[in-house]
A protein has these predicted regions:
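Metal-dependent amide/peptide-bond hydrolase catalytic core
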Residues: 1-14, 18, 22-23, 30, ...
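A short glycine/serine-rich beta->alpha loop
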Residues: 119-128, 191, 224, 278-284
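N-terminal helical capping/dimerization or prosegment-like subdomains
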Residues: 2-94, 99-102, 356-359
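Acidic/histidine-rich catalytic neighborhood of metal-dependent amide-processing enzymes
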Residues: 130-209, 247, 320-342
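Sec-exported extracytoplasmic/periplasmic mature domains
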Residues: 33-41, 66-67, 142-146, 299-306
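Predominant activation on well-ordered alpha-helical scaffold segments within soluble catalytic domains
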Residues: 62, 135-142, 171, 205, ...
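Active-site metal-coordination/substrate-binding segment of hydrolases
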Residues: 89-159, 163-165
Length: 362
């Protein structure tokens, strides 16, 4: 049933959409294949404008835009591909960068469009977030052009190159460029998202210290790959370990659901790996965070405050297995419209003299 106040999609829009699918389905896949092959992950300390992969990706965008008869403008961190010359504009907002990737988790290269591993699916880094929508938008604009649809607004496809890592260049761009009067973001679930969670990061640094002891101690603790991913992997190394500790941890490991542990004792070195389930950090409930679960497995011991051990103790004392930060002081917050703020430890970064825990807030 269609609500009486709902504007129905016009015949011209439906016909043009059907035409785009019938005419350009294969071309859209080829377009996506050409975009996916560029590893547009941000490199720490390297500007997008100095990153060869991003430069090559933008060159591919320019090539595709020109081939489709669309205009192209490169403003550094922002690429604009347009159709029409009208004063009023509608913006289609996307991004060309992608999150880091662990190739070991992929059947094929993440930067090669895989159409065979799961028939009917297009698999590759960025196919959904957000290179697939770019290819779709390009050929939607091409179909409109083919059909000579009379536009009352110019269409502008915006492709930001640092959505996953740095929003400051976008803020600067907005200050110096007049934005379209209407904007649509195709970087979310369909059909419509009315609001998006805010993003914040808490960074905690624990100094590494040499503290000789004959007791078992945590010498390494690691996990996570990127700030906005719920990590499915985490690992810990315990020195001065023994069979008694191994057996105690193995018994406890069997009590968990949704996460598995692999424990291996070689001499007096015990390695513990946790395997949870990855998810986007805006929906931590869809995953199982390996970092706090591994810390929880180790919680029966109060570890030496040497850096990694301090971190394990801190996670157990102040974060736990909850998703809302209720153990982290008074930070927990709930909004009637957006629901509870989520609080997820997502990355542990190793430095020469310290270990850093990044906590993602949404």
């Amino acid at each position: 049933m269609v609500n009486a106040n709902t504007t129905q999609v016009s015949y011209a829009a439906r016909a043009t959409a059907d035409y785009a699918v019938a005419t350009y389905q294969n071309a859209m896949v080829d377009s996506l294949r050409a975009l996916v092959k560029h590893n547009t992950v941000a490199k720490e300390g390297v500007s997008i404008n100095d990153n060869p992969a991003h430069t090559a990706f933008k060159a591919e965008l320019k090539k595709q835009a020109r081939a489709l008869g669309l205009d192209y403008k490169d403003d550094g961190y922002v690429v604009v591909i347009g159709l029409g010359t009208q004063k009023q504009r509608v913006g289609i907002i996307t991004h060309g960068d992608v999150q880091p990737v662990n190739p070991k988790k992929w059947a094929k290269s993440p930067f090669e469009l895989d159409i065979t591993t799961e028939p009917g699916r297009l698999i590759g880094r960025g196919t959904e977030d957000d290179k697939g929508p770019i290819s779709t938008a390009l050929y939607a604009m091409k179909a409109i052009k083919d059909k000579s649809i009379a536009l009352n607004k110019r269409i502008e496809l915006y492709i930001y190159m640092a959505e996953e890592s740095d929003w400051e260049p976008l803020k600067a761009y907005i200050k110096t460029h007049e934005l379209p009067q209407t904007n649509i973001t195709i970087d979310a679930e369909y059909p419509v998202v009315t609001a998006e969670k805010g993003y914040g990061t808490v960074k905690l640094v624990f100094n590494k210290q040499e503290k000789p002891t004959i007791l078992p101690y945590v010498s390494e603790f690691s996990g996570g790959f990127f700030g906005s991913q719920i990590p499915e992997d985490a690992s810990a190394t315990i020195e001065n370990a023994n069979i008694v500790l191994l057996q105690r941890l193995m018994r406890k490991a069997r009590s968990y659901q949704g996460v598995s542990f692999d424990l291996e004792l070689k001499g007096s070195t015990l390695t513990v790996n946790a395997l949870g389930k990855s998810a986007h950090s805006s929906k931590p409930e869809d995953g199982v965070n390996a970092i706090p679960y591994l810390a929880d497995l180790l919680s029966s011991t109060r570890w030496e405050s040497n850096g990694p051990g301090t971190l394990v103790n801190f996670i157990n004392d102040n974060i736990g297995l909850g998703l809302e930060g209720k153990m982290f002081g008074n930070i927990a917050y709930k909004d009637d419209f957006m629901g509870a703020m989520t609080f997820s430890p997502t990355v542990i970064k190793q430095h020469d003299k310290s270990i850093e825990l990044n906590i993602n807030l949404r």
